[in-house]
C-alpha cells in the first residue's frame, strides 16, 4: 500500500470512524469556521497555493470577496495554473461591476448558470495525486470568508474517489449548460440591475422621508464600545484630580466625536478646541454640533484669520491665529474650563507652547494618532503621562470603526531586467513602460464604488508632476499637489477628487496627516517604505468610512528596497523587532481581523524576506530608540515588563545584543546605581535561563526558595501539589539549573556564583546570591525577570511532551524539557540518541563555505516527508544507523527541528515527531568521499503551509 493511500485510510478512519486514534492525517475531514484563530479564507488560499487547477461553484460573489483572492490568482496565472468559476445572477445579488472584475482574471474562465435557485457554495482543488474541496455555507464574500459564523467542511479524496468524481461530474454538467461571461452579457445585465436598484432606492427614500421627522427628534449620538471605555477612563483620570490626559487613536476612529461626548459629559462653562488646519476646524465644529445640546448657533464660534467669535461658549481656533500674543492674551488664563489640542503631537512646537503654557483650564485633553512623532518635547510629559485611551489600527479594524481595506504588496516594475531600487533614476520611475505597468496593476486590483478616487504617494515633487502629466496624457485625469501649492488651490483639487472630476491626486507627503478625504477608495504607494509611522499615516488616508465605498484598495509597489522590512512592522503594529514575528505575519493569511486582508504577490513577498534577512533589528541604535520611546511614555526608566506592556521591543532582542538589561543601561548611562560583577553575572543567568519562560517550574522553584530554605521533600511535595503537569524529574532539572550542575564546568565565568546550594537534606540560597538580594537595585531587576519569565511561559503552556509545534527551540531547550542531566548543546551535533529520545536539528540552507564533510543535503520531499543524512563516516552496518532503522521497535522517538539557515542562530522550528520510512535507507558518499547513510523520514503531521513555504522557498 502506498504511503498516500495509507495516509488516506487512516485520515478517513479518524474522521468518520474513531476520533480517538492517534493518527494526525493530512487528509482528515475538517470543519471550517471563522473564529479568532482561523478563517475559511485561509484554507482556500492554502489550497490554491498547492493546486494544479481549481473549480469554484458559488452563487454569490462580492468585489471585496474576490479582491481577497486576487493576489493569489495572479501568482497562479504566472505559474500557468488555470481555473473555472461557475456563478449566476440569482436574486440579482451579484453586481455588474463584480462581473467586470471577474473578466480581469486572465487564467480563470467564468460562466453563468440560469438554473433556478442556484445556491451552490463549493470550491474544488485538484492536486498532483489527490483532490480536495471546501463545501458548505460560505459564498465568495468577505464576510463569509472571514467574519460570519459559517459551517464548511474540507474534504480530500484520491483521484479515483467516488465523491470527487460525483462533484466534478455535477460541475461539468452545469458548466456545459452555462453561458460564458462576456462584456456584452454584463452590459445587458447592468440595465436590469440598475432598474432594480432604482426601485429599491425609491422604496428606501420613501421610508426615510416618512421617518425623517421622528428620527430627527429622537436621535442622540451614543458612544460605541471603544468610546465608552475611553470616556470611563477620562472620568477616572479627573476623579483622581488630574487635569491633563492624552487620547491616542488611529485616523478615522472618531476622536472628535469622542471628545465631543466627553465635553457633553463635563459641560464646561467655556470650551476651546485648537487645531492647525482650518478645514479640520470647520468639520470639528460640525461634529460637535451633532453631539452637544444646541440652544442657539451663537454658542459655536470660530477664531481664525476671518472670524473672531471670542464670546462663543464652544470656540474652535486655529493655532496660527490663536498663538499671536494679542489673540490668546485677550483671554484670561482661566477663561476656558476645557481645552482640546487636536493633533497633539504638534504641541511641542513653539507656537503651541505659547498657548499651552498660558492657559490654566480645569482639564486639558490632547488627541493624536502618532504621539511618537515629536522630535522636541515629550508629548507624554506635556500631558503628565496620563494616557486615557489608546486605539491603534488593528484594534480599530476589529471593532469596525474604520473602513475595511485590501492591501496588496505588488512587485514593482522591472526596467530591462533591473528591479527598482534605492538609486533608480527618475527617468525610469516615470517611463512610459512603468506608467503602463502602474495602470495595469491599479486596474487589476480595482476599487470599491462607481468612480475611482485615488491618492498616489511618490518619492519626489518632480516624480509627482511627471507622473501626473503621463497619466493625464493617457486619459486618466490626474493632478500633482505639493507643499508649493497654496492652501486654496489644494482645497479646490481635493473637491474635484471628491466630486469625481479628477481620478488621481499625486503627492509626496502632503497628505500624511491633517487632510480628510473620506471618499478615497484607492491608495497607491509608489515609494519605498522608510518609516512605519508614515506608512500607516498614508494608508490611513483611505480608512475613513464613506457611503461611496465598502472598502479601500491599498496597492504598495515593492521594489528592491533595503527598508522593505518596515512593511510588516507597519501593517502588524508589532514593534517587538522580533524577526520571527514579522515572518509569521507575512505567511499568515489570518494576520488581520475583520474583513480586511493583507496580500502579497509572491515576488514582492520574497523582496520583504530578503530585506528582513539582511537587516539587523538588534542594532544598538534601535534598542536605544525603543528604550527612549518607552521612557518618554512613562516618564521614568522602564523595566523589561514595561516594554511588553507598551507593545515595544521584545526583551529577547535586548538580550541578543547585551548580556543583560543592566549592561544596556550602564552602557548608555541610564542608571546611576552600580552592581557588583557577581550581581551582574547573576542577572546574565536569569536573563538567558529563566526569563525565556521555557518551563514555569523554574521560576516557581526560585520563588519558593526566595521565601525560605526547604528540604528536598518539602519542595517536591509543595510543587507536585500546587503545579499541574509536572514531574519529580522537572523539579530535579530546575534545581540542577539553579545550582549550575546542569551546565559544563566554568559556567561561573559567565553566570557568577550559583543561585542555590544543596546537600543531602537542605536546599538554600547561596551566600553570594543572598548578599545580592540585599541590593535593592538587584532585587528590582530580579523581580522584573521573574515576571517576564511567567509572561513568556504562556506560549509554552499547551505543549505535548513540553514541545509545541512551530515554536522555536535550541538544543539546550530540548535538554531541559526532557530533563537531561547535562546541557546537550555541545554534544547534539545534528542529532543524538539519548534514552528514548532522538532530537534531529537540521539547517535547511547551508552556507557554501562549510566543509565537505558536513555538506549534508537534507531536503523536504513533500510537506510530510524529509530526505535526511546521518553523520559522515557512517554505513548501513554502523551500530548507530542500525539503532535508527529500528527506532520504533526500540521505542525511540524522533523529534524534528529545522531552521532555514545558519544566520537564524541557535533556534529551530519544532516540526513534530517523525519515523523512518522502511526501505528508503541508502548508502551514499559525502562530497569529500566519506561514507554517509541517507533515508526518508515521514513526519507524523504535515508541516503547516506557511512554515513549509518559509523554510523551502
Spans of features found by a protein language model:
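Post-DEXD/H (motif II) to motif III coupling segment of the RecA-like Helicase ATP-binding lobe
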Residues: 345-406
Amino acid at each position: 500500500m502506498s504511503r498516500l493511500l495509507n495516509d488516506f485510510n487512516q485520515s478517513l478512519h479518524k474522521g468518520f470512524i474513531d476520533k480517538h486514534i492517534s493518527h494526525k492525517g493530512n487528509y482528515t475531514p475538517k470543519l471550517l469556521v471563522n473564529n479568532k484563530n482561523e478563517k475559511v479564507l485561509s484554507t482556500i488560499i492554502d489550497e490554491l497555493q498547492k493546486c494544479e487547477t481549481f473549480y469554484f461553484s458559488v452563487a454569490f460573489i462580492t468585489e471585496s470577496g474576490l479582491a481577497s483572492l486576487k493576489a493569489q490568482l495572479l501568482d497562479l496565472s504566472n505559474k500557468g495554473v488555470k481555473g473555472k468559476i461557475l456563478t449566476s445572477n440569482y436574486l440579482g445579488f451579484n453586481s455588474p461591476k463584480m462581473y467586470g472584475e471577474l473578466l480581469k482574471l486572465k487564467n480563470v474562465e467564468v460562466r453563468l448558470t440560469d438554473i433556478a435557485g442556484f445556491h451552490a457554495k463549493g470550491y474544488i482543488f485538484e492536486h498532483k495525486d489527490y483532490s480536495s474541496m471546501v463545501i458548505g455555507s460560505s459564498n465568495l464574500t468577505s464576510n463569509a470568508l472571514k467574519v460570519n459564523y459559517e459551517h464548511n467542511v474540507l474534504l480530500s479524496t484520491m483521484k479515483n474517489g467516488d465523491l470527487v468524481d460525483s462533484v466534478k461530474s455535477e460541475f461539468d454538467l452545469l458548466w456545459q449548460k452555462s453561458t460564458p461571461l462576456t462584456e456584452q452579457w454584463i452590459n445587458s445585465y447592468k440595465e436590469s440591475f440598475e432598474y432594480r436598484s432604482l426601485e429599491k432606492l425609491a422604496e428606501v427614500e420613501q421610508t426615510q422621508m416618512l421617518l425623517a421627522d421622528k428620527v430627527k427628534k429622537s436621535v442622540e449620538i451614543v458612544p460605541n464600545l471603544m468610546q465608552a471605555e475611553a470616556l470611563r477612563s477620562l472620568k477616572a483620570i479627573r476623579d483622581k484630580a488630574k487635569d491633563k490626559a492624552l487620547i491616542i487613536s488611529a485616523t478615522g476612529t472618531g476622536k472628535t466625536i469622542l471628545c465631543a461626548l466627553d465635553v457633553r459629559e463635563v459641560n464646561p462653562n467655556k470650551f476651546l478646541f485648537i487645531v492647525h488646519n482650518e478645514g479640520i476646524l470647520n468639520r470639528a465644529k460640525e461634529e460637535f454640533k451633532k453631539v452637544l445640546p444646541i440652544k442657539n448657533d451663537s454658542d459655536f464660534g470660530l477664531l481664525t484669520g476671518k472670524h473672531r467669535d471670542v464670546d462663543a461658549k464652544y470656540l474652535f481656533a486655529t493655532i496660527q491665529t490663536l498663538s499671536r500674543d494679542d489673540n490668546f492674551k485677550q483671554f484670561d488664563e482661566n477663561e476656558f474650563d476645557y481645552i482640546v489640542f487636536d493633533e497633539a503631537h504638534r504641541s511641542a512646537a513653539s507656537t503651541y507652547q505659547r498657548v499651552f503654557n498660558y492657559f490654566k483650564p480645569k482639564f486639558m485633553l490632547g488627541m493624536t494618532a502618532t504621539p511618537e512623532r515629536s522630535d522636541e518635547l515629550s508629548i507624554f510629559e506635556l500631558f503628565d503621562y496620563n494616557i486615557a485611551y489608546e486605539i491603534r489600527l488593528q484594534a480599530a479594524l476589529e471593532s469596525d470603526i474604520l473602513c475595511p481595506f485590501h492591501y496588496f504588496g505588488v512587485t514593482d516594475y522591472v526596467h530591462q531586467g533591473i528591479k527598482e531600487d534605492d538609486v533608480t533614476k527618475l527617468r525610469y520611475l516615470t517611463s512610459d513602460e512603468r506608467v503602463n505597468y502602474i495602470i495595469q496593476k491599479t486596474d487589476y486590483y480595482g476599487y470599491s464604488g462607481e468612480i475611482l478616487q485615488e491618492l498616489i504617494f511618490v518619492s519626489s515633487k518632480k516624480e509627482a508632476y511627471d507622473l501626473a502629466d503621463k497619466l493625464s496624457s493617457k486619459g486618466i485625469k490626474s493632478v500633482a499637489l505639493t507643499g508649493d501649492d497654496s492652501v486654496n488651490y489644494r482645497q479646490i483639487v481635493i473637491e474635484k477628487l471628491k466630486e469625481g472630476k479628477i481620478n488621481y491626486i499625486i503627492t509626496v507627503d502632503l497628505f500624511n496627516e491633517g487632510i480628510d478625504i473620506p471618499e478615497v477608495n484607492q491608495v497607491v504607494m509608489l515609494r519605498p517604505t522608510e518609516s512605519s509611522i508614515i506608512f500607516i499615516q498614508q494608508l490611513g488616508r483611505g480608512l475613513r468610512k464613506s457611503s461611496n465605498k465598502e472598502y479601500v484598495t491599498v496597492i504598495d509597489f515593492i521594489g528592491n528596497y533595503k527598508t522593505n522590512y518596515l512593511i510588516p512592522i507597519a501593517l502588524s503594529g508589532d514593534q517587538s523587532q522580533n524577526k520571527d514575528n514579522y515572518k509569521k505575519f507575512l505567511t499568515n493569511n489570518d494576520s488581520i481581523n475583520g474583513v480586511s486582508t493583507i496580500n502579497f504577490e509572491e515576488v514582492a513577498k520574497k523582496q520583504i524576506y530578503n530585506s528582513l534577512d539582511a537587516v539587523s533589528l538588534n542594532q544598538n541604535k534601535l534598542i536605544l530608540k525603543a528604550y527612549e520611546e518607552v521612557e518618554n511614555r512613562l516618564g521614568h526608566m522602564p523595566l523589561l515588563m514595561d516594554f511588553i506592556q507598551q507593545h515595544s521591543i521584545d526583551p529577547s532582542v535586548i538580550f541578543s545584543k547585551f548580556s543583560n538589561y543592566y549592561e544596556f543601561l550602564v552602557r548608555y548611562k541610564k542608571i546611576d546605581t552600580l552592581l557588583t560583577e557577581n550581581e551582574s553575572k547573576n542577572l546574565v543567568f536569569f536573563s538567558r535561563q529563566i526569563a525565556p519562560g521555557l518551563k514555569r517550574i523554574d521560576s516557581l522553584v526560585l520563588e519558593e526558595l526566595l521565601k525560605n530554605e526547604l528540604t528536598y521533600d518539602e519542595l517536591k511535595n509543595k510543587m507536585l501539589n500546587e503545579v499541574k503537569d509536572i514531574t519529580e524529574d522537572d523539579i530535579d532539572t530546575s534545581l540542577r539549573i539553579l545550582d549550575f550542575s546542569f551546565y559544563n564546568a566554568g559556567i561561573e565565568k559567565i553566570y557568577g556564583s550559583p543561585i542555590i546550594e544543596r546537600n543531602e537534606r537542605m536546599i538554600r540560597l547561596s551566600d553570594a546570591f543572598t548578599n545580592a538580594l540585599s541590593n535593592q537595585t538587584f532585587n528590582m531587576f530580579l523581580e522584573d525577570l521573574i515576571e517576564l519569565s511567567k509572561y513568556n511561559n504562556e506560549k509554552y503552556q499547551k505543549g505535548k511532551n513540553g514541545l509545541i509545534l512551530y515554536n522555536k527551540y535550541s538544543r539546550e531547550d530540548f535538554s531541559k524539557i526532557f530533563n537531561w542531566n547535562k546541557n546537550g548543546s555541545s554534544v547534539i551535533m545534528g542529532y543524538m540518541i539519548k534514552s528514548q529520545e532522538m532530537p534531529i536539528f537540521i539547517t535547511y540552507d547551508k552556507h557554501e563555505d562549510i566543509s565537505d564533510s558536513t555538506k549534508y543535503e537534507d531536503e523536504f520531499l513533500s510537506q510530510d516527508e524529509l530526505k535526511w543524512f546521518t553523520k559522515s563516516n557512517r554505513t548501513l552496518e554502523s551500530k548507530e544507523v542500525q539503532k535508527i532503522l529500528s527506532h520504533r521497535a526500540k521505542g525511540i522517538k524522533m523529534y524534528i527541528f529545522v531552521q532555514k539557515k545558519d544566520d537564524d542562530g541557535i533556534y529551530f522550528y519544532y516540526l513534530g515527531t517523525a519515523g523512518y520510512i522502511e526501505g528508503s535507507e541508502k548508502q551514499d558518499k559525502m562530497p569529500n568521499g566519506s561514507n554517509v547513510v541517507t533515508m526518508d523520514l515521514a513526519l507524523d503531521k504535515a508541516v503547516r503551509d506557511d512554515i513549509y513555504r518559509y523554510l523551502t522557498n
